[in-house]
Amino acid sequence: MKRTFPEALQSFQEQFENILSKVVEFRQELHQHPELSWQEVETTRRIRRFLESFGITRFHQPTETGGWVDFVFKEGAPFVLLRGDIDALPIQDAKDVPYKSQNPGVCHACGHDVHTAVAAGVAAAVQAGGIRLPLNLRVLFQPAEEPIPAGAPKMIEAGVLKDVAFALGMHVDPRIPLGTISLTPGWVNMQSIQLDLLFEGPGGHSSRPSETADLIWLASRLIQDSYGIIYREFDWMKFPIMLTFTEIEAKEGYNIIPKKLRLTGTLRLTSTQAKNRFYMRFRNLLQELESENHIMIRFIKKEGAPPVHNNPRLIRALREIIQRETPDQFHVIDNYRSPGGDDFGFYAQQVPSALVRLGIQTRDDQPGLHTQYFDAPPEVIEVGLRFFLTVLPFLQQEVLQ
């Protein structure tokens, strides 16, 4: 299908094709040279060089990596924030493509190279095309989306949300067909919380379990009872919540009941109410196991980014702009949610926000996110660029009223 811009941007069509080819090349360059969270020094240099090639020289860099550029069209007007995350993952790239990662053990396996390229492409298009927007525009290249603690709070501390009316973000998704865009209101990403537990007991001989506390058996009880809380006490339609235990370790010997056992799990949810309710019930289970079996259980939780909640009015405005200005050019769905986390949730906590999903699925066995064969087709870059360049000229502060 031939894609076009809204009538107001028709004169930009030919220029866009030239910019698009450069953005695709830039994405491949980023993919070849991935860097881990908080180490994106060369990535930041590459972003700055790309922007400078389009005459964008004022780059705000309050931290060692990442930063943002501002486009001021009207003094005193608020900003629209467009976020692109820039970090990669500690995964060996196993793909056979010309732009395969050249950094051993590091790969853009979550599509952040695409996000960065699209964000940079929007900035380049606005600059080169002389596009004027009703609100000011801030394009953020954010480091360290992946780890705990994540990069979004650092950017917020540095002032990236100053005078921002609302924020837009994106994420490629291999479960959504290429060319499809998800504009889903409400929660779209869960909060991820790491649960670390250390069981300590007297230990003993495996032939006399009645004389000691069997930590492996007690850990299995905790796992079963915890799953019971999640799947029998929570109405998933009201409180989406997931719990998965992923690691258990007790290295003593085949005939030794261990003195120490480590258990790790992941809790995912979308609301503070559900989180507090789970913590209360979970701590009660721990106390019961401790008192009944004369053991000690140390519980440490590491909370990741808050859940991402898309502002319903902003989502509706984006849908209406697309339907009005470029009907039939984008296939839009409105009911796609992910149990994964994203630190875009920190922005969504403070300003009305929308995290847009860009489909990249081209076959049934599409490699998933965070895998060594993950890749995104170059066509998604055009979809992302056209989407943001279509909606930004029509986004007004009034959409939230």
Task: For each feature predicted by the language model, list its residue ranges.
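Metal-dependent amide/peptide-bond hydrolase catalytic core
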Residues: 2-5, 220-401
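Acidic/His- and Gly-rich active-site-bordering loop/insert found
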Residues: 2-108, 113, 117-133
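Divalent metal-coordination and catalytic microenvironments
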Residues: 30, 82, 112, 139, ...
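Active-site pocket-shaping loop/turn-to-helix segments
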Residues: 33, 210-217, 273-278
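Active-site beta-loop-alpha junctions enriched in small/polar residues
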Residues: 35, 85-87, 144-146, 173, ...
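Histidine/acidic-residue-rich, glycine-tolerant segments that coordinate divalent metal ions
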Residues: 68, 89-91, 96-107, 113-114, ...
